[in-house]
């Protein structure tokens, strides 16, 4: 079976610098572009967007929410679902010990993301999370009913999946002070006389998704993923990296 993949390279102002829609050479016109069209399960890559970023931001705005990089959280299931503890971590286990939020994110602990989400002060934590990722990070493929639950928001088991392009644009906010830019693939279009017919103005799509403080903390947390967490095998030598790993059922998506 052929393994497929997709990639988007984008600068911090939304300009798409490179895009790969699948492995191998292009064989057809208007074929499937997996980077922009395929909706795949995000797994744990959703956690910074649906849990950690929103939780840190909430702590700046709500005195009843106190969630920080150093917050101590128990590595244990949050609740019992159908007679079974939920969630468990990769491999089905949990330690029962107390760890920092930073460690839980770096090691991609499902228990920590679920408990962090539950710590958001008001009863509508899941609604807050879904609204944040949909309207601040512009992930457009989420189901407003089916994905408004702990499993989709805390562990990434969403209904329809997400695209690589939208995830790239969302993650860029952690590296540019919290600003979201709509991704674009052109700068301008001219007619045969050289008249500008269409010109992209990225600043018009600029929105504040996160405070500068939250973006800075998230950047540092995601650097830990690459230096001392699940992403150590993927870091680039000599380049400061931040990122997040994600794996779905039976390793179908990574």
Model-predicted segments: where are they?
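Thr-Gly-centered strand-to-loop micro-motif
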Residues: 74, 115, 157, 243-245
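Glycine-rich, acidic and aromatic/proline-enriched surface loops and short helix-turn segments
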Residues: 9-25, 57-59, 78, 97, ...
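Active-site SXXK
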Residues: 14, 41-73, 104, 170-174, ...
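A penicillin-recognizing enzyme superfamily signal
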Residues: 1-9, 18-19, 25-38, 65-66, ...
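Conserved catalytic neighborhood of penicillin-recognizing serine enzymes
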Residues: 60-127, 192-219, 223-224
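Extracytoplasmic/secreted envelope proteins and their assembly/folding machinery
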Residues: 29, 33, 52, 70, ...
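Secondary-structure capping and boundary motifs in well-ordered enzyme cores
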Residues: 6-13, 38-46, 93, 97, ...
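Mid-domain, small-residue-enriched loop/turn segments at the edges of structured enzyme/sensor domains
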Residues: 85-89, 121-168
């Amino acid at each position: 079976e052929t393994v497929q993949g997709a990639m988007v390279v984008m600068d911090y102002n939304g300009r798409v610098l490179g895009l790969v829609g699948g492995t191998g050479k292009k064989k057809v016109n208007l074929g499937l572009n997996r980077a922009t069209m395929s909706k795949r399960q995000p797994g744990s890559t959703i956690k910074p967007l649906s849990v950690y970023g929103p939780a840190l931001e909430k702590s700046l705005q709500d005195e009843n929410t106190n969630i920080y990089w150093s917050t101590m959280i128990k590595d244990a299931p949050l609740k019992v679902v159908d007679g079974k503890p939920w969630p468990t971590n990769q491999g089905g286990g949990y330690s029962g010990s107390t760890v920092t939020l930073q460690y839980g994110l770096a090691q991609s602990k499902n228990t920590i993301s679920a408990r962090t989400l539950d710590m958001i002060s008001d009863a509508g934590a899941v609604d807050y999370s879904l609204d944040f990722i949909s309207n601040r990070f512009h992930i457009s493929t989420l189901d407003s009913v089916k994905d408004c639950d702990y499993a989709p928001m805390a562990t990434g088991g969403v209904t329809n999946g997400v695209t690589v392009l939208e995830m790239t644009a969302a993650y860029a906010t952690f590296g540019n002070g919290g600003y979201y830019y709509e991704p674009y693939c052109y700068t301008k279009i001219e007619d045969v006389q050289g008249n500008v017919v269409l010109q992209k103005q990225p600043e018009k799509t600029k929105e504040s998704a996160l405070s500068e403080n939250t973006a800075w903390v998230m950047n540092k947390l995601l650097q830990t993923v690459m230096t001392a967490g699940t992403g150590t095998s993927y870091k680039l030598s000599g380049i400061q990296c931040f990122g997040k790993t994600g794996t779905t059922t039976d390793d179908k998506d990574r």
